[in-house]
Amino acid sequence: MFTEKGIFPIGDGLLDVDADRLKGLLVSCPDINEIYEVEQTPFARGKFAAVRRAIHKNTGSHFAAKFLKRRRRAQSSDKEIKHEIAVLMLCEGEDNIVNLNAVHETRSDTALLLELATGGELQTILDNEECLTEAQARHCMREVLKALKFLHDRSIAHLDLKPQNILLAGERIEDGLKLCDFGISRVVCEGINVREMAGTPDYVAPEVLQYEPLSLLTDIWSVGVLTYVLLSGFSPFGGDTKQETFLNISQCALTFPDNLFGGVSPVAIDFIRRALRIKPNDRMNATGCLDHIWLKDDCSLDRQIYLQPQSDAEEEEEEDVDDDVEDEEEEEQVEEEEEETQNVEEPTTEAPQQQQQPVQQHQLAKSGQIHSKPTHNGHHRANSGGSISKIPIATSKLQSTPSSETTTAIHTLTSNSNGHVHKPTQIVTPTRRASDSDKENTYTATFVKKPVATIQLGSSNGIEDATVVATLTLFPDAPTTPKVIRKTPTGESNGSATSVKALVKKFQLEDSSGSAVARRSGGAVTSSSGLHSPTTTSVRLNSIRRASEPLTTVYKKQTSQNGCSSTSNPSSSPGSSPTTSGSTATLLIHSQRLGNSTAPASHCVAVPATATATSSASSSNSSSGKSTSAAHHLHHHHMHHHHHHHHHHVVIAAKNAAAVAATNNLSLDQGIIC
């Protein structure tokens, strides 16, 4: 594939150079400044390269020293650098490609001593003049395509064709152009699939964005974009963002506004359209672009550009002459008909006035039969619903009585009043067809649905097994402790001074006693809500939702067993009191020392680590039976039931211990540790 000795492919579209072949270009001196006088300020800079002017100290020759970093993104870039050197060596001697003169290597970078193009970049001319003339653009594209053809004949795709990589050999475009920067070029041939996501956003082809195999025709897409930019000064697919630009490229959203392409020849637009095809196989190759009529022959192109408007003008003149002849014939026929009508009318003053209107109507009808297009001042206009046609009617030769006046009137009427029936024009917008690979450019719409307040899902087992899904709000409140509002007990409403701490703890004991009674009785649970009045209300456990619970909470109704109502998760019932709502209710009651205790230490309940409530109650001989039976029952329940059901038994024991403490006149501050 490559005739050059010492250059060979290494895979992934890259080339390598043999060490013996590379020695002929390497500069033996370790310091480049000893041989060349290198300017410190670069006149071109890229991501991984900087170009500075270098002057040979012995010969005085000027070069463009391109300094390439040998490490990019913490990885070695020796393969890419050698590939660029190999491509430049293959292009040695080509007039439209910069030549490589020498290579200098250091630990940090590699310097390529390239041919210096004194005219600078083509982008500089576009920045100063906005766009080129069509003759300049044609000459520029011809030079670029010659360089591309040289590369494509060697199965090399440039893949980064843009005005910044096209250099002027002199001050003018006519002095010659040279192609440069082969850093992302790749070898593309049959049997080698090369996929690269590299290039300039405005110039990349659709197959690059779709990560499809590249080909030599990928450069032809950039040729079409470059031609568009040179003729108009604007990017054909440029958007506000890169994503919008890529979408326009994938859909080939190509337009030619009149304010940009009003003076551009149709063959130039045809050249752009043939190059900008979504499918690579539908595009022209480099040879086909050079053979296109826009680039092939300047003289024939100029003749076609100037002869086409001239032929259009001649056709318009012929149509005008035919229309004038038809107008004269029409006027003669109208005059004859009016004379015949005037001969049969009576010599009265009202008859001519009554007869003039039918004559005019007949004339208009006749005019509609003769002309398919209305005329206005000798110019043709298309028949549209909103257009106005002015038709002159000649009546100067009519004989009239002294009481009547003959005038020449111009009647204005809409063009849809003609005799011919015109079909309405149907504007059909051509459907833009994307490539087969363009399957990801879809538009999605987001619909926001508000949740339903409460949804009840029934089951075949009846109402008791039904599941209630409560979905109340999209933004639940922050998890906070519910506030408890209660009235002052009537027994302490007198003037006796009682501490707030004692009252609160007394309320906790009373509420614990009330909850225990409710759990014993079964059925409904009596509780007080933190946001309502303190009156007790019988409610279902599955009808209340905390503000701190998740967005959607599922509650299941439980059936009562053994006369005791319980839930699988007591902490999720907001109607319970603070003593029973969690597993951290701290209640430790100490009674007075008693000599005789019938409750041994082994009967004390070993509460799990998650619960910190422990009941250790000892009393006199009369109350020891209650404490012993309560502790024994709690221990027995812990051995045979799930550990989540231990809370209400602790409350029962606490209630009995509180009753014992009340009978022994214990103070509240002595028996509670918060």
Swiss-Prot record:
PROSITE patterns: PROTEIN_KINASE_DOM (PS50011), PROTEIN_KINASE_ST (PS00108). The modification Phosphoserine is found at residues 384, 387, 435, 437, 521. Residues 37-295 form the Protein kinase domain. One of its GO terms (cellular component) is nucleus. Residues 308-388, 412-440, 511-583, 614-650 are annotated as: Disordered. Keywords: ATP-binding, Kinase, Nucleotide-binding, Phosphoprotein, Serine/threonine-protein kinase, Transferase. The keyword Transferase applies. Residues 312-343 have a biased composition (Acidic residues). Residues 526-541, 555-564 have a biased composition (Polar residues). Pfam families: Pkinase. Its EC number is 2.7.11.1. ATP binds at residues 43-51, 66. It comes from the Eukaryota. This is Death-associated protein kinase related. It comes from Drosophila melanogaster (Fruit fly). The lineage of its organism: Eukaryota, Metazoa, Ecdysozoa, Arthropoda, Hexapoda.
